Amino acid sequence: GLADTADALGPHSREKSLEVMRDSRIGTFGAVALWAVLTLKVAALSALSPHAFWPVLLAAHVLARWSSLPLARWLPYAQEAKGLGAGLASLIDVRGLVAATALMLLCLLGLVGLRRGLWLLGGALAVLLLTGLFYRRRFGGVTGDCLGATNQLIEALTLLIATHPHF
């Protein structure tokens, strides 16, 4: 998802960008994006204190995976040929999204507490909003690759926020 979305960011038309996402090969932008996000995650994880490592890692994972639900619910599916993201989008109704959000909040607060949870949630919501607006403008909606890219970006940002000395 992250690599395909990054590869689609080149100077392409919307149609060409979506075609690039369907291509199974990885390009330069995709390789650089994978390297950058993986390096950021490793650096952030190595900077976490031992007592915060597991709660923060789990909180990052919960937030990142939850982010697929509002994106898939609120944005149209961008590709003609239906992929995995289209199946997810068709399953999410408002009640399901509210229930998943409540469960995510319970997990987040149970793992890192209220103050830290609000910081992590704020970062995740900022990434969710910015990527959602970008996907709508650039691709006309969301794809499964976009959902995966947002997952990885939110996970990396969550880990980075948790390394702040006042976290």
Where are the predicted features?
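Hydrophobic alpha-helical transmembrane segments
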Residues: 9, 13-16, 23-167
